[in-house]
């Protein structure tokens, strides 16, 4: 087992990994408003044997989520919280991510002309609701302030209920259970965090759990056309096996494999925290190379794709995540961290950072602001998206100073 005191200290390299992935996510998510984006930056189309930068970011973020799990749970135990209380906290966080994911994903269908508000107003109200319910309010200095914060939460709930009941998509459909990215994070976090509660930092249990997710992915992902084009376990539809995976929200195992990989690396990092920097760098990069080689081997049998969570994609992205964390940890140990200040809010107020773009998009929709055409094509379009990502982080920083920060 690891020295539990390691988990009481914040790991800056995890914050950096989370910040880099969120910054990149904001950057690539803004591509919808520009044109002529290089293919290697974009999402691959379904069935394409390719992963662009946009395809790599989300799995890397899931890996970072996994790295945070041991620290978050061990800190709760160190503060005296019980396993039951910690499980309740995990369920609460999962519920928050599912709710936020549903509101964001439903809005991506846009709105029916009969809706009582345009999409921009929907996004404004959504942000107000999220902040009202999940803001990290300062400790109340008086009973009046405590009641005020409670009122803000109630207002937030009422705003979200109003949106849910009045939402209509362009086909007239009502608010649906579409979880989106945040929901996927929520379900994956739930699975891996519950496993950690039962296993703690005992790798003899966590490594088989990761191996099980990998095995599910290997057996359940369709092979290349040259090998038949079907999964090794090609059961008929509505079978018990797939039904159980669906109930547990494991899917084909790819998403929890990313997160459980992060959990394992986090434990190894804590366990060998006292080793020399050179030792950690060599071993971390060696593991990354081995994962890369396994990815190359599996690529012979499966295409590499984010959509469908293919085995080569799992191994490639895990290799990237391990290598990136190893390098970041090395930079931290050598105090090369000044650059991190530029994107720090994306690592310490990550959920707020993810919400801020919708406020900007809402403002653009309501006001009718349109970017000049020369700023939406090719290289200048990429500069546009890069500047937007930095502006989002700057706004998040200001919001933190004003005590506005989402905390679930």
Positions of the model-derived regions?
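Alpha-helical transmembrane segments and their immediate juxtamembrane cytosolic regions
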Residues: 1-408
């Amino acid at each position: 087992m690891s020295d539990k005191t390691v988990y009481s200290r914040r790991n800056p390299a995890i914050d950096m990994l989370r910040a880099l992935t969120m910054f990149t996510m904001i950057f690539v998510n803004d591509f919808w408003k520009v044109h002529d984006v290089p293919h290697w930056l974009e999402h691959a189309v379904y069935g394409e044997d390719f992963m662009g930068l946009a395809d790599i970011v989300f799995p890397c973020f899931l890996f970072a989520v996994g790295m945070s799990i041991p620290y978050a749970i061990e800190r709760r135990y160190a503060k005296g919280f019980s396993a039951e209380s910690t499980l309740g906290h995990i369920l609460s966080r999962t519920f928050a991510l599912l709710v936020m994911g549903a509101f964001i994903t439903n809005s991506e269908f846009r709105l029916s002309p009969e809706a009582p508000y345009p999409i921009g107003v929907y996004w404004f109200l959504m942000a107000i609701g999220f902040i009202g319910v999940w803001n990290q309010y300062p400790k109340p200095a008086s009973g009046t302030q405590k009641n005020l914060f409670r009122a803000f939460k109630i207002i937030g709930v009422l705003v979200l209920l109003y949106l849910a009941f009045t939402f209509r998509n362009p086909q007239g459909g009502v608010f649906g259970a579409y979880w989106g990215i945040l929901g996927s994070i929520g379900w994956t976090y739930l699975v891996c965090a519950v496993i950690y509660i039962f296993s703690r930092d005992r790798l003899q249990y966590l490594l088989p759990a990761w191996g099980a997710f990998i095995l599910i992915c290997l057996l359940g992902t369709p092979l290349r056309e040259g090998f038949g084009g079907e999964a090794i376990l090609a059961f008929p539809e509505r079978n018990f096996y797939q039904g159980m995976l669906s109930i547990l929200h494991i899917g084909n195992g790819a998403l929890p494999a990313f997160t459980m990989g992060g959990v394992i690396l986090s434990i190894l990092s804590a366990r060998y925290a006292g080793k020399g920097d050179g030792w950690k760098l060599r071993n971390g990069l060696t593991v990354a190379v081995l994962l890369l080689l396994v990815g190359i081997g599996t690529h012979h049998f499966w295409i590499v794709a984010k959509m469908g969570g293919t085995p080569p994609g799992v191994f490639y992205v895990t290799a990237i995540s391990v290598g990136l964390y190893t390098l970041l940890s090395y930079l931290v140990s050598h105090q090369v961290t000044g650059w991190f200040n530029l994107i720090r809010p994306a690592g310490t107020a990550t959920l707020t950072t993810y919400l801020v773009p919708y406020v900007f998009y809402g403002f653009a929709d309501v006001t009718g602001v349109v970017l000049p055409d020369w700023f939406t094509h090719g290289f200048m379009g990429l500069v546009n998206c890069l500047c937007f990502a930095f502006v989002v982080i700057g706004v998040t920083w200001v919001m933190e100073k004003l005590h506005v920060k989402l905390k679930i």
